[in-house]
A protein has these predicted regions:
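Selective recognition of specific alpha-helical transmembrane segments in multi-pass small-molecule
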Residues: 112-120, 207-222, 233-253, 286-287, ...
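Transmembrane alpha-helical segments of multi-pass small-molecule transport proteins
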Residues: 27-32, 78, 107, 156-160, ...
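Membrane-interface loop-to-helix entry segments
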Residues: 29-36, 40-53, 177-180, 201-250, ...
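Extracellular/periplasmic helix-exit of transmembrane alpha-helices
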Residues: 120-128, 132, 243-261, 269, ...
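Flexible loop linkers connecting adjacent transmembrane helices
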Residues: 43-70, 93-103, 107, 115-149, ...
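Hydrophobic transmembrane alpha-helices that form the core helical bundles
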Residues: 97, 106-110, 114-129, 133-191, ...
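N-terminal alpha-helical transmembrane segments of multi-pass membrane transport
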Residues: 1-85, 95-102, 113, 249
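Alpha-helical membrane segments and immediately flanking helix-loop junctions
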Residues: 64-97, 123-145, 158-161, 276-323
Length: 388
């Protein structure tokens, strides 16, 4: 069939636009912009790392400062959105599409993204406003209007509109439904049709259950989100990190080889899908952007509600996000997938969360997939309340 004669549907237009936006424009904006901010700030993210940790611990906090949540709760609220399925499923997709070298470019994007987050979240404190209930709020929709002026309000409205369709919570629910279907619904033949596929009713009911659980948290506002995130984030990172260390310890002999492969493949582009160097770089940058959100503006909403009068202090706290999210959690996932060798195995060629599940099954037999399921539930839940 001649694809040139196929009608240009809305889905095709959306895909063409997405492929273009997530190509060279994204590379220039994220890496180029991040490099500019890094040099312009005279390498603030790296020189003031110790000071940022002191701020996070509350050394300079004043309970009388304006805001709704403390520095730690603000960072956890931001991390609840960033440390999600992008760290588990997104890394697996990056390795499948761009090869091991994509991880290297995720690191590059995270390093320069620290400066981007520093400036973005400093602006969130410098130019913030109040919502209809009188609570202090921040984010691009506020500092565009407060900083640039009311004539730029259409840009703030556009940000909100495109953010709504930016797929952020969709990926979380999609991957969570996928692993729940594979591990529970299909084996128990719950809501399964004659072709052994989960029915729309089963997926819909699971979606309703997720919506109810998330609503209980987000209806309490930024304060409840901050409190839940402050308890959930340390637990899920510790659980996921502990499981990962067990897997890496049992495959310790393969870890040095996996690290070497990341650096060598970063410049050769020998991807699983047969990609080239440009595909490796763009894949790494895309997944890093989705994972740590540096430059996307969403993180500024959480940090904009922090209790502080010093914009730079919150910027220093915010820049820890890409380091925790990409340089630590994403790297752990990548090393698990590479050291266990599941990314090279043939079969159904699963990607996303199912590929990571195979790595957990191989690294921790029997219990591995169920431990990952708990992690996925926590990561997805935290991300969806963070995006709210």
């Amino acid at each position: 069939m001649n694809t040139a004669t196929e009608p240009l549907t809305f889905a095709k237009i959306l895909k063409l636009t997405s492929d273009w936006l997530w190509g060279m424009p994204l590379l220039v904006l994220l890496i180029g912009g991040g490099l500019y901010f890094t040099i312009y700030s005279r390498f603030v993210p790296f020189l003031y790392l110790r000071h940022s940790i002191q701020i996070l611990r509350g050394k300079f906090s004043d309970p009388n400062d304006p805001g709704e949540i403390n520095h730690f709760q603000a960072l956890c609220s931001a991390l609840s959105a960033t440390v999600g399925m992008g760290n588990i499923a997104g890394v697996a997709v990056a390795v499948t599409e761009g090869g091991p070298g994509a991880l290297f470019w995720m690191w590059v994007c995270a390093l320069v993204g620290m400066a981007t987050k520093f400036f973005t979240c400093s602006l969130a404190i410098m130019y913030r406003g109040k919502d209809h209930t009188g609570q202090v709020q921040g984010g691009p929709m506020y500092f565009i209007v407060e900083g640039l002026g009311t004539k730029w309000k259409p840009l703030a409205m556009a940000f909100c509109f495109f953010g709504l369709f930016g797929c952020l919570p969709m990926f979380q629910s999609n991957q969570l439904t996928s692993i729940v279907s594979e591990m529970f619904l299909k084996p128990n033949e719950w809501f399964v049709d004659s072709d052994k596929n989960v029915t729309a009713l089963g997926q819909g009911l699971f979606g309703v259950l997720m919506a109810i659980c998330i609503s209980v948290v987000i209806l309490g506002g930024i304060k409840r989100i901050g409190k839940v995130a402050a308890r959930l984030i340390p637990f899920m990172v510790l659980l996921y990190g502990s499981c990962a260390l067990v897997i890496l310890f049992t495959h310790a002999a393969q870890v040095p080889e996996a690290i070497a492969l990341i650096f060598s493949d970063a410049f050769t582009g020998e991807a699983v899908a047969g990609g080239v160097l440009g595909a490796v770089i763009s894949t790494g940058v895309r997944r890093a952007a989705f994972s740590n959100e540096a430059g996307m503006g969403t993180e500024a909403m959480a940090h904009g509600a922090a209790k502080t009068k010093e914009p730079i202090r919150e910027g220093l706290v915010a820049m820890l996000g890409p380091m925790i999210d990409t340089l630590i959690v994403c790297t752990i996932t990548g090393l698990i997938i590479l050291s266990t060798g599941v990314w090279q195995e043939t079969g159904n060629n699963p990607d996303g969360v199912l590929l990571t599940a195979e790595a957990f099954t191989k690294g921790i037999p029997i219990a591995g997939p169920y431990l990952l399921l708990v992690c996925v539930l926590c990561f997805s839940f935290s991300s969806m309340i963070g995006f709210s």
